[in-house]
Amino acid sequence: MSTREIRIATRKSALALWQAEYVKARLEQAHTGLQVTLVPMVSRGDKLLDAPLAKIGGKGLFVKELETALLDNEADIAVHSMKDVPMDFPEGLGLYCICEREDPRDAFVSNTFDSLETLPAGSIVGTSSLRRQAQLLARRPDLQIRFLRGNVNTRLAKLDAGEYDAIILAAAGLIRLGFEDRITSTISVDDSLPAGGQGAVGIECRSADVEIHALLAPLHHVDTADRVIAERALNKRLNGGCQVPIACYAVLEGDQLWLRGLVGQPSGGTLLVADARAPRAAAEALGVQVAEDLLGQGAEAILKEVYGEAGHP
């Protein structure tokens, strides 16, 4: 393969294609004459839309097929939503670029109500995330949480059809797809802590492709990467994936990194929260530290219960 050509493995969803096109445009802007093509494919997570993610189980639901394409030399890089990327990579692959983060917050979307606070008791709220469910029910145990999967357009259509009083989505996805006007209100990270890596785009490639690594370097955003490294370290220590009730969010404060982590019962009955600060150079250690604090509060028992109900380890 010539280093003047890059093939991007991507899922076929509108949001995934937006992310891949974004990376394509950035690469072409940074490297005159570089040919960039997309290799769209369907992941297991895209096929299994009739069950909650926690019930499907397994990590890498949205990335495994893309990684296979890299290993089989059918593509040169794979573009992912960072919140979907497992903590560990197959031998020969690695994460070599994290792009600048979009708004990491969750968004409240409703055609009738202005905010989570104004929802009447008994309102039906759609989400596919145990993380969101745990935090929503902790604040509003009077709400009904109903399963919601599908791409952004599908979820909005279900809301518009009256199946839900409100739905909760990642603000970043709505903004990127041009649906910012559908965001009724953004939810503060104090009220709904995001998933680790939410709003960030990551690029995976073969570890041996040093020329590709060099081409990706201009797209790497160090401030975002340091935050996401801390968040992912917490997730890794808790053995978490995108389908468990773990939340974490890091903020840069000068040369210091602040990280908050949360583990919650899906019922909202118990929310465990921990936070700490450390020099940004110690991002990974900070993630482990906050995870250890959560484990000391009893996070392991909550996560074992969730995994047990889902029927997978």
UniProtKB/Swiss-Prot annotation:
Cellular component annotations (GO), alphabetically ordered: cytoplasm
Residue numbers bearing the S-(dipyrrolylmethanemethyl)cysteine modification: C242
Cofactor binding description: Binds 1 dipyrromethane group covalently.
Keywords attached to this entry: Porphyrin biosynthesis, Transferase
InterPro entries reported in the protein's UniProt record: HemC (IPR000860), Porphobilin_deaminase_cofac_BS (IPR022419), Porphobilin_deaminase_N (IPR022417), Porphobilinogen_deaminase_C (IPR022418), Porphobilinogen_deaminase_C_sf (IPR036803)
The reaction(s) this protein catalyses: 4 porphobilinogen + H2O = hydroxymethylbilane + 4 NH4(+)
EC number(s) on file: 2.5.1.61
Record has Nucleus as a keyword: no
Cofactors required: dipyrromethane
One Pfam family hit: Porphobil_deam
Pathway(s) annotated for this protein in UniProt: Porphyrin-containing compound metabolism; protoporphyrin-IX biosynthesis; coproporphyrinogen-III from 5-aminolevulinate: step 2/4
Tagged with keyword Glycosyltransferase: no
Molecular function per GO: hydroxymethylbilane synthase activity
A GO biological process held by the record: protoporphyrinogen IX biosynthetic process
Assembly behavior: Monomer.
Family: Belongs to the HMBS family.
Other known facts: The porphobilinogen subunits are added to the dipyrromethane group.
Function: Tetrapolymerization of the monopyrrole PBG into the hydroxymethylbilane pre-uroporphyrinogen in several discrete steps.
Name used for this protein in its record: Porphobilinogen deaminase
